[in-house]
Amino acid sequence: MKSTKMTTAQALVKFLDNQYVSFDGKEEKFVHGIFTIFGHGIVVGLGQALDENPRGLKVYQGRNEQGMAHAATAFAKQNNRRKIIACSSSIGPGAANMVTAAATATVNNIPLLLLPGDSFATRQPDPVLQQIEQSYNLGITTNDVFKPVCKYWDRVNRPEQLMSAMINAMRVLTDPAETGAVCIALPQDVQGESFEFPEYFFKKRVHKITRPLAVEEEFYECLNIIKNKKKPIIICGGGVRYSEAGDTLSKFANRFNIPIGETQAGKSSIKSSDLMNLGGIGVTGNLAANIIAKDADLVIGVGTRFSDFTTASKSLFENPDVEFVTINLSKFHASKLDSCKMVGDVKECLEYLYKLLEKENYISSYKDEIKDAKMAWKEEMKKLTNIKYEENFDPIIKFRNKESLEEFKKLTDTTITQTSALGLIRECIDNDAIIVGASGSLPGDLQRMWETESLNSYHMEYGYSCMGYEIAAGFGAKLAEPEKEVYSILGDGSYLMLHSELITSIQENKKVNVLLFDNCGFGCINNLQMSNGIGNLATEFRYRNDETNKLNGKLIPIDFAKAAAGYGLKTYTAKNLEELKNALIDAKKQRVSTLIDIKVLPKTMTDGYESWWHVGLAEVSEKESVNKAFENNKKVLKSARKY
């Protein structure tokens, strides 16, 4: 048996460089690089290995550990989970910074390999810099906090443990049903320790991503339900995207006259113009999809995990005879809502089910309902994209501090409404441009309003809805598809939370366009707060008022364009639609990352359509408005499904 004496870190780099995946006969390299922010717990171990021989791995320099891990997540998502960039950090705060990103990847079922440094396995110098000491367990370190948010976790306390740790890491990372974040903690002394690693550990490994078919019994159980239903609706989830089953789903839906509602993860898997595509469904869904869903007697969940936003907290489907059928690689997700399930690959299962339904001569009983619903939404879209600020302007959102809008208007001199801005952006950017989003009111507006004919051009992280994902993810998406324009669409709140990877985009010459919607606050949470009878507390960006000692002073103005220009971005400020249009046109000509500071009037985002969201309201309050909100919530909850 041949072996090579190497340090643990050197062996790790060599192993990662030899990982490949195969899908539909196409073989691709799996690990394309590694993000790192070197600290004392990683630089002389893994850092030495990468300096001496990085092999085929490109080393990227992050600016914030959470940010670089979000970029890696987006890179994997935009590559349909078949390519990754690993992330390494020092011990302590560097590692802890990646926990949020790990949770984001796991919730969204995106492969993310994290390699945080750790304290000494020998414990000789304990407590080392940045080490947490727990008197009840000296084996606990910061990295233990990754356990709840990862799909696989391991710590390499001896060099030879690296082999089983990495084999299992790859097992999870390349499993479509179980993938998510993987954490392999690397004690800093072990990184530099050597071992005679067998050559077979470094052999080229091709991880086959297969298309398993559900068992025949499951198909026929589902068939017996479907063929007796008159008004089914399909929910298109992220599984459609990752199975590359968009065309198959479109063919299926059009053949059997079944309308489709899109989740955030499923959007852009099929064309917006598809005759059966109603658009976004659920809490952030549009009028067309939610109206059809209310009367549906069958819900066919395809590659979806049925989040509360998709099901409107299980209140959306009001037909008393409604049943659920699912297609999903994950038995866990397929079993939700007492569904009759087909556990298997989306594309393969749809093709098999197509043949069975065709033999039954099945067709839904919809007549003009689908067309009428789409037409009604088309008319609503015209209104939304043409909302203009005028004298005595009344914004879409009615629950508000009436003075805020005029105060913001006076402060910024803007006339831009959020929905009209989105309409203009859609008109101006390339048809195949990738948009990236995650948090605030914009994901709701985008799920409702954004239309695209370009496959996988809608990149929304709405499983964890992580503020700060957008810009880092825009960079990651650009790394994945450098030939396309990428637009990170986010609010001022999210921008302030995390935008450090803009510098990395400059460093790597990978252009990201930032569309920053500034409404001087956390707008969507202000909506949620005030619509449930609560006062306007700490959701607008205001100075502290010396007289009241509360955060109800004047609005805080920020020149985001000026600040970003200091980083080296090409920047613009838009206060009217003409300025926005000119900025969008000019930004396309730039080779460097850009930022458009769009001053948007508060409360001009879209509102909900025929949906409800269950949030934890106070049962008792001195304010009648809060009590009323609780009673309304209680009333809807009675009719919602219990699990």
Swiss-Prot record:
Molecular function GO terms recorded: 3D-(3,5/4)-trihydroxycyclohexane-1,2-dione hydrolase activity; acetolactate synthase activity; flavin adenine dinucleotide binding; magnesium ion binding; thiamine pyrophosphate binding
Keyword terms: Hydrolase, Magnesium, Metal-binding, NAD, Thiamine pyrophosphate
Pfam family for this entry, one: TPP_enzyme_M
UniProt-annotated stretches for the region Thiamine pyrophosphate binding: 441-521
Catalytic reactions on record: 3D-3,5/4-trihydroxycyclohexane-1,2-dione + H2O = 5-deoxy-D-glucuronate + H(+)
Broadest EC class assigned to this enzyme: hydrolase
SUPFAM superfamilies the UniProt entry points to: DHS-like NAD/FAD-binding domain, Thiamin diphosphate-binding fold (THDP-binding)
Family per similarity comment: Belongs to the TPP enzyme family.
Residue positions binding Mg(2+): D492, N519
Cofactor note: Binds 1 Mg(2+) ion per subunit. Binds 1 thiamine pyrophosphate per subunit.
GO biological process, one term: L-valine biosynthetic process
Job of this protein: Involved in the cleavage of the C1-C2 bond of 3D-(3,5/4)-trihydroxycyclohexane-1,2-dione (THcHDO) to yield 5-deoxy-glucuronate (5DG).
GO cellular component annotations of the record: acetolactate synthase complex
PROSITE patterns: TPP_ENZYMES
Documented EC number(s): 3.7.1.22
Lineage, highest ranks first: Bacteria, Bacillati, Bacillota, Clostridia, Eubacteriales
Name this polypeptide is given: 3D-(3,5/4)-trihydroxycyclohexane-1,2-dione hydrolase
